[in-house]
């Protein structure tokens, strides 16, 4: 089948593969973008195995932390012009404050909850009202709410800030630590949130990474290694080695800390625990970005 130039360019942007390879992949996969990505991975032409955290054309991420609770959300817009609008920024700030105050299990329940801005409508209706005023489609596309169940801290970070707690990307991370909240622990949590924004992990640990993701990657790697024509014993070791590199990219505890370029996050937690005289553990994190 014939595929459009825009689809080829989009696939190239996602995968980093050449235009010709992207065209071949899309034609082979009948224009299916997801299948084309897998096709390129199997050919060893792409490393784009991470899902995107950037599904809005534009917009803002808003974060708020207060005590043992933290909230984060992504408010999408069609253009940067609207994302920079004061009403849009105010809406993002009001929504994340409401999320922090009331909490929510998921996007659906939060959207159905009353809007705190005094208009007497639901969160979803207020977003629709804002879209009518601003003149383009606006969507509340993701939320995250973390609350500590014991001693610890919640850290946050905003990248590309355009206001307090509002920017182009953001993360929350909850740390469990059996010690008093100190400036050192809070700063450590902030640094971890900064790392999460930059490194974009898919899970905290190997055990919590989706089995479907792991098995799909193992199948792709096995096909890549099979093409090398190595003996089975050698091929098996190559597959294991490539899977370890996969985990080091996808899993937070296996990643290398961006601020020193050498220490694994799991070792960083151990070292910080020794400094503080207690165990420090990552309970959960939330990450969003736009643009």
From Swiss-Prot:
Q: Name one GO cellular component term.
A: cytoplasm
Question: Which terms are listed as keywords in the entry?
Answer: Cytoplasm, Elongation factor, Protein biosynthesis
A Pfam family name for this chain? EF_TS
Show the segment(s) annotated as Involved in Mg(2+) ion dislocation from EF-Tu.
79-82
User: Where is the major localization of this protein?
Assistant: cytoplasm
Fetch the SUPFAM superfamilies from UniProt. Answer: Elongation factor Ts (EF-Ts), dimerisation domain, UBA-like
KW Cytoplasm (keyword) present = yes
GO molecular-function term, one example from the UniProt record: translation elongation factor activity
Q: Which PROSITE patterns does the UniProt entry name for this protein?
A: EF_TS_1
Q: Where in the cell is it found?
A: Cytoplasm
Cited HAMAP family: EF_Ts (MF_00050)
Which family does this protein fall into?
Belongs to the EF-Ts family.
Provide the function of this protein: Associates with the EF-Tu.GDP complex and induces the exchange of GDP to GTP. It remains bound to the aminoacyl-tRNA.EF-Tu.GTP complex up to the GTP hydrolysis stage on the ribosome.
Identify this protein by name: Elongation factor Ts
Organism expressing this protein natively:
Anaplasma marginale (strain Florida)
